[in-house]
A protein has these predicted regions:
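The Walker A/P-loop phosphate-binding site
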Residues: 36-135, 158-159, 336-338
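Flexible beta-alpha connector loops of hexameric P-loop NTPases
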Residues: 138-140, 162-167, 201-212, 241-248
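A short beta-strand-to-loop transition that corresponds to the Sensor-1 phosphate-sensing loop
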Residues: 118-119, 231-236
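Short, small/acidic-rich helices and loops at N termini and domain boundaries
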Residues: 1-49, 92
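C-terminal regions of RecA-like/P-loop NTPase motor modules
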Residues: 91, 171-187, 223-225, 237-339
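Structural motif
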Residues: 85, 160, 188-191, 264
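Helical hairpin unit composed of two closely spaced alpha helices linked by a short loop
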Residues: 188-227
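Cytosolic-facing regulatory segments adjacent to core modules
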Residues: 104-186, 200, 293-295
Length: 339
């Protein structure tokens, strides 16, 4: 108790300097750390006393992705305390993928908390309506009664919380989750759309350091609330029309992905968008194989996304094939032009 009191005194004195710098996020962290001191009675895993625990079967309580192929790789989906990242270029459907993942969890009876930092909460909710019912986004108002019936039958719960871009930090999300917990709403899955748009608790000279810190905090949040967190990240321009987006295409901070448990990329060229297709590349998987490529069906008008069985093609084969197809297409156009 004495140590806790002294720590709180130090935190208050430190907060005075931080207040002059308007470092409100750091003040919150310093005070919270001081309050938590002494409240944790877990001294760690005792190697001898806790011997039997090493042989107990661990329960991940994974939440399904709704995709048989991905669930098979991830041993049922994303587990408790794990961080999953969806990587895609702008306009490829990152938010749509996150809505799909949230919908599958809600259908499975889970409570999903979906944070949106870019789109309005009603837009996100409408996408859930479409994904859940199969009704086109443009036709939702015409099928209001049908949608209401479908929503009423869903076992799970969904809470969509909107924050202006770069206004919320991981601490902001933590405070909101704590308020929900006090209202007897415990998150079974958290979705952050998307991590790159969160505000870092501290400003760094380099953006990649800020992003790395944000993703580390998100991983910590998943562990703290003992549930999976899905978020997304944007690729650089090199991934905009790439056949397959690999780890090298991740924008700004390659290191931010090291903390994630499961990473997959979504690539959709112009040709893919015209045919409602694309590719998923499993870039990292802590509980199974990775480096695998899957074709996908993606109809953004109905938020319908399906991962199809793998074809066995490698990244190199796909890129080579694409280059040859483009060359043949250009030759054909040149012939028509000459004639």
């Amino acid at each position: 108790e004495f140590c806790k009191k002294q720590k709180l005194k130090e935190a208050i004195l430190q907060s005075v300097d931080l207040l002059q710098k308007s470092s409100f996020e750091e003040i919150s962290c310093v005070i919270n750390e001081a309050i938590k001191l002494g409240s944790d009675n877990n001294f760690g895993y005792d190697y001898k006393i806790d011997f039997e625990r090493r042989f107990e079967k661990k329960q991940r309580n994974a939440v399904t992705t709704g995709w048989t192929e991905i669930d098979a790789l991830a041993r049922g989906g994303l587990g408790r305390g794990e961080l999953g990242v969806v990587i895609a270029p702008t306009g490829a459907g990152k938010s749509m993928v996150l809505v799909h993942l949230g919908t599958q969890a809600v259908k499975a009876g889970k409570t999903v908390v979906h944070y949106t930092l870019e789109l309005q909460d009603t837009i996100i909710a409408s996408r859930y309506d479409s994904c859940l019912t199969g009704v086109s986004l443009n036709d939702l108002h015409d099928f209001k009664d049908h949608i209401a019936e479908k929503v009423a039958d869903v076992e799970g719960e969904l809470i969509v919380k909107e924050y202006p871009t770069k206004s919320a930090s991981v601490s902001t999300l933590r405070n909101h989750l704590e308020r929900l917990r006090r209202s007897d709403k415990n998150a079974d899955m958290i979705i952050v759309d998307y991590g790159d748009l969160l505000r870092p608790k501290k400003t760094y000279k380099e953006r990649r350091t800020e992003l790395e810190t944000i993703y580390e905090e998100l991983r910590g949040l998943a562990q703290e609330f003992d549930c999976p967190i899905w978020t997304a990240s944007q690729t650089n321009r090199g991934g905009l029309n790439a056949e397959v987006i690999t780890m090298e295409s991740i924008s700004e901070a390659f290191n931010k992905c090291f903390v994630a448990d499961f990473i997959f990329t979504v690539s959709r060229t112009i040709a893919h968008k015209n045919t409602n297709s694309g590719r998923v590349f499993v870039a990292k998987n802590r509980v199974g194989p990775d480096g695998l490529i899957y074709p996908i069906f993606m109809d953004t008008s109905r938020v319908k996304i399906e991962v199809l069985p793998a074809t066995g093609e490698t990244v190199e084969e796909i890129v080579t094939k694409s280059a040859k197809e483009q060359e043949e297409s250009l030759k054909e156009k040149y012939k028509k032009y000459r004639s």
